[in-house]
């Protein structure tokens, strides 16, 4: 069976709350780091989430 192209990543809040989302990303089509604006329930605001590796 072939190995999938999509890799698991973690989106970490830039607000410094420690909150994160997990998602998958195709490394071949999107080699750059992902930055998305998502809701942080700790500060109850939309903040920028940046890509980090899952350890």
Curated annotation (Swiss-Prot):
One of its GO terms (cellular component) is cytosolic large ribosomal subunit. GO terms for biological process: translation. The keyword Ribosomal protein applies. It holds the Pfam family Ribosomal_L33. Keywords: Ribonucleoprotein, Ribosomal protein. One of its GO terms (molecular function) is structural constituent of ribosome. This is Large ribosomal subunit protein bL33.
